[in-house]
Amino acid sequence: MSDLRIAVVGLWAEDVPATAHFYRDVIGLSLLAHHHGERPHFDLGGSYLTILKGRPVPAQDASPPHFPVVALAVEDLDAATERLRAHGVEMPWGVEGDAQSRWVKFYDPAGNLVELVQFEHRA
């Protein structure tokens, strides 16, 4: 089944409007003009992120302990972190990286651990 790809990623939030505002206005995702009732959908370039009503619960005894619920690729991590700072988003571990990528992790308003990652382009 090599033609499989992710269609929808769902995140839970007790305050759906505040969390949708965060993904639209802070992260910069495009909110689709139509969505299913109270479940906002964001375009991820052929896949979708939807915010569902509910209480997010972190994994118990997780290993590693700070692995994100979802990681979103960005072209310019420096610009993305500046945008997060401008909106008062705490980034508890700062910008991290290795030879292949750089990333920053933070919590959305619902408490979901999210990561923005920039992959290093090699010529």
What is the predicted function of each stretch?
Residues 1-20, 68-72, 120-123:
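N-terminal beta-strand motif that seeds the catalytic metal site of vicinal oxygen chelate
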Residues 4, 10-49:
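Core segments of cupin and vicinal oxygen chelate
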Residues 41, 71, 103-104:
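Short hydrophobic/aromatic beta-strand element in the GNAT-like acyltransferase core
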